[in-house]
């Protein structure tokens, strides 16, 4: 599960602008994939190679009634789940009753809160911050999100330490969980009403999850441990993720965050697609997110029963066209969650993907495969010199990380990197898991001697003169 930063405050104080600064700095919004409109409500950001999630909770007001009141209450869910809260206020307009209301809500929570005084461009920062100390929060900081003034300092000062502490604790906790779990943790993801909860019940063999024929029945991730044929599993039925324009309720927006966190916390992700609706950009976004996070993947095309042969051919052609990047290694199953058709095969692919994602490979085997790949397809020339790959070893699991050391590796063409991935995948029979390749430049063991010799020769020449 990722570190979560919640941006809260009344309306029109610049929360969305700060959100864009935090997420756009590394162009890493959750749904910022080709052909998909960037979502401005929740996103993924990076600080010093550490990923974290950001949620803009929308304006909070003490005058909210009806549906707006419901949304304001659900915004508090995001605050409850957050590891750090940026409470944004407007430095130009000064302290308002709306700000005081938000502050009163935050004082009831045991949360790390930073009062972010925005829009201070052209004003005295100290004067702008002064009145906001009355909230009782000891951390107050002035920025101009629109002009990115002090925004990096904000992150360096208030995010760096808790983020590093969180991941240290989280790594230890995850290692403990893995020791205790000894099973496969997989999540079902997809749009609303594609049959995730029905598939969950079918896999469990009982009605553990409430199912209705309407979108959005599941609003939070439901985690259920179980055992099948002696193998332990934990299944996570996630909330459906809809198209950006249709995600309006704050509760639903936060359920998207929970879904993304479930993906990151899984060993294997099962992407469920409705055969009758086809695969959408939103399906592709979720699949891309899973792959980007190194998750093993299985695709289940549901509601296959009752379709004509002509429609089935059309669906398969559509899948082949849109999922061309998965054809080589991801298993695709055409199922009926309602009737149980082919659900057993989904389990088989989950087991296979998990095993491949955690496959043990010795340094000798990795190096041997690398050498065989080079023998089969020579390395390209870089100027007068040929790139040289020396040895390879495994740098991690789930996903498998192959680290290759050599000379001039930074100039290795992407086409050759793809060739290496395909070669390793075929040789090791990797199914269902992405493979990450890291290329490291080998250090010259004689570099220091050479530099020292040059210095000595320089000193001697000076003496001669």
Swiss-Prot record:
- Recorded family membership: Belongs to the TRAFAC class TrmE-Era-EngA-EngB-Septin-like GTPase superfamily. EngA (Der) GTPase family.
Q: Does the keyword Repeat apply?
A: yes
All residue ranges annotated as the EngA-type G domain in the record: 3-166, 184-358
Q: Which organism is it from?
A: Francisella tularensis subsp. mediasiatica (strain FSC147)
Purpose = GTPase that plays an essential role in the late steps of ribosome biogenesis.
Residues annotated as region Disordered?
446-465
User: Which residues are noted in the entry as GTP 1-binding?
Assistant: 9-16, 56-60, 118-121
Recorded hits in InterPro entries, A to Z, give:
G_ENGA (IPR031166), GTP-bd (IPR006073), GTPase_Der (IPR016484), KH_dom-like (IPR032859), KH_dom-like_a/b (IPR015946), P-loop_NTPase (IPR027417), Small_GTP-bd (IPR005225)
What does the entry list as the binding residues for GTP 2?
A: 190-197, 237-241, 302-305
Boundaries of each KH-like domain copy?
359-443
One of the GO biological process terms: ribosome biogenesis
How the protein assembles, per its UniProt entry? Answer: Associates with the 50S ribosomal subunit.
Q: Which HAMAP family match?
A: GTPase_Der
Stated name of the protein = GTPase Der
